[in-house]
C-alpha cells in the first residue's frame, strides 16, 4: 500500500532529523554521552515532538493511523502478522529507548492527550466494524496508543507494565491475524 510507504518514510525522516540533530549537538552517538548532555527546554520539546511524531507515524498514533487499517485490509495475512507483531513493536521500542536515554524534563500533557484520543477514536471505530481484519487492526491501534500514552507518562512502574503489554500484544496480534486467515481460508469471506 502506498499509504504504508509514505507514512513510514515520513516517520523515518522525522526520526532521522531528530537523531542527526542530537548527534551533531552532542558530538557523539554514544548513549552515555547523550545521556549526560543537557538540552535547552526548546530543544528538548522540539526533539521530543519530532521523535513522538516520527515513531508515532510508524506505531501508529492518532490521527496518523489510517494507513495501518488500509495496509492490513489490502495485505496478505502473513504481512499483517509481520507488521503487527514486529514492525509496529520496533517503532515502540525505538521511542521507548530514545525517550529513556534522553530523559527530557518537559510537560508531555498534549502528547498524552493525543494518545488518549487515539484510544477513544479506535474504540469507537471498532464498535460497528464488520471487516474482521479492520477490527483487529483497530484493536492494534487502540493498544499501541495506550502503550504510547504509558511511555509519555514516564513513571517507571507503568513503563514496565507497558513493556510487558507490548510483548503480550506482539504474540496475541500475530495469533489474531493468523485466526483471521484461518477463517478466510475456511469460509472464503
Language-model features and meaning:
Residues 1-189:
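Hydrophobic transmembrane alpha-helices and their helix-loop junctions in integral membrane proteins
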Amino acid at each position: 500500500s502506498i499509504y504504508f510507504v509514505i507514512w513510514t518514510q515520513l516517520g523515518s525522516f522525522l526520526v532521522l532529523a531528530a537523531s542527526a540533530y542530537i548527534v551533531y549537538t552532542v558530538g557523539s552517538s554514544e548513549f552515555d554521552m547523550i545521556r549526560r548532555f543537557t538540552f535547552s527546554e526548546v530543544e528538548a520539546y522540539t526533539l521530543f515532538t519530532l521523535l513522538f511524531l516520527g515513531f508515532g507515524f510508524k506505531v501508529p498514533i492518532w490521527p496518523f493511523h489510517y494507513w495501518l487499517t488500509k495496509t492490513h485490509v489490502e495485505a496478505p495475512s502473513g504481512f499483517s502478522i509481520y507488521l503487527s507483531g514486529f514492525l509496529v513493536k520496533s517503532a515502540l521500542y525505538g521511542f521507548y529507548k530514545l525517550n529513556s536515554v534522553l530523559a527530557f524534563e518537559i510537560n508531555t500533557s498534549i502528547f498524552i492527550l493525543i494518545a488518549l484520543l487515539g484510544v477513544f477514536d479506535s474504540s469507537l471505530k471498532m464498535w460497528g466494524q464488520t471487516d474482521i481484519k479492520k477490527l483487529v487492526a483497530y484493536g492494534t491501534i487502540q493498544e499501541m496508543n495506550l502503550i504510547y500514552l504509558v511511555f509519555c507518562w514516564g513513571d517507571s512502574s507503568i513503563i514496565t507494565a507497558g513493556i510487558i503489554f507490548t510483548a503480550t500484544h506482539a504474540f496475541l496480534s500475530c495469533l489474531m491475524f493468523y485466526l483471521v486467515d484461518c477463517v478466510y481460508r475456511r469460509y472464503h469471506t
